[in-house]
Amino acid sequence: MKDLPKLKSGRKLAVPVAIWTAKLESGRKLAVLVAIWTALVLAPFWTPLLGGYTALGTRVLVLGLAAMSVNFLLGFTGVLSFGHAAWFGIGAYGCGMILKFVALSTPLGIFAGTLAGGLAGAVLGALIVRRRGVYFAMVTIAFGQVFYYIAFQWSSVTGGDDGLRPFYRQPLHLGVTTLDILNNAVAFYYFVLFCFALAVAAMAFILRSPFGRTMLAIRENERRARFLGIPVELHIWIAFTLSCFFMAYAGSLYALVNNFADPRGLHYSQSGDFVMMAVMGGMRSFWGPLLGAIVFVVFQDYVSSVTINWQIFIGFLFVLVVLFFPRGILGAIRRRVAP
């Protein structure tokens, strides 16, 4: 009986300790978030000091968004798609066709490309949502290759192997001023960063919502989620569709980066690159795919300037990461800095 007050006192002490631990973790996450956005905002100023250039940072943002789109489905729902390059390419072609044939409007091109890719993904998702595992992945590859060969063969519309060109991103008229995103690389970087921030905010909002928690429940145990009455197929279809919209959005931005769209953007090898970025960075973390894209794009840019066989070195790097950092680069960093 004399020990009871000690136990009670211990419990009282445990409460503030838990609160302070939670506050410390929250403060750490906030500090990391501030560091990430500060680095992105100041990238045009510090990348040249490291031998980089502004356009490289722009490519990192766009491909990082594409990798995060794949991870939205793979990392948080547990569904692997090897055909996401199809929506990336459709977004690029949709944006390019608007700028080339319809109207000289950058926002309209982005909107049209995003809508085209997202709706195409929604239709396909409704057809294959009951497939799982390798069957789902193979069906997405097959449909992706269908779109690839359409773009490759329909040369009168898509330009065939040469791609859709020429079209150019147009200046943005912001009331009293005009932002020249065609000739000013820094201005274009900040425009892409703004678009990137909108997509990231939307992803974060969805993942923090009840729907996002349901996605995680399906990832962890689909059978249990189904037993609890969750309409699994509906949630997977919605997650797949949202992922396709984000991917098409990234594809639209990529068309603006290059001022052309070509069939290679729809090829399954491009899907493999996106999955590789997500896995290298850490596919069960929100920011991991962006880190993977940074490593992939910078490594590719450097090695390709030395040898045309840069894919060999990228593959070797990927194998090393998978063997020694199974949770990705970000996962390894978290383990090392964790108290």
Q: Language-model segments: what does each one mean?
A:
Residues M1-L40, T214, I218-R223, F227-H235, ...:
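Cytosolic-side transmembrane-helix boundaries in multi-pass membrane proteins
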Residues M1-L65, G94, V102-G109, N184:
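Membrane-interfacial amphipathic/re-entrant helices at transmembrane-helix boundaries
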Residues S9, K29, L182-D262:
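Helix-loop-helix "hairpin" substructures at the membrane interface of multi-pass membrane proteins
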Residues P44-F101, L127-T140, M215-I218, E222-R226, ...:
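Single transmembrane alpha-helix segments in multi-pass membrane proteins
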Residues G57, S81, G94, G121, ...:
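Generic structural signal for small/hydrophobic residues in well-ordered secondary structure
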Residues A85, I110-F111, G121, I236-F324:
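Transmembrane alpha-helical segments in multi-pass inner-membrane proteins
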Residues A92, V102-Q145, L291-A293:
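Alpha-helical transmembrane segments within multi-pass membrane transporters and channels
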Residues F143-I181, G212, A332:
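Extracellular/periplasmic helix-loop junction at the C-terminal end of a transmembrane helix
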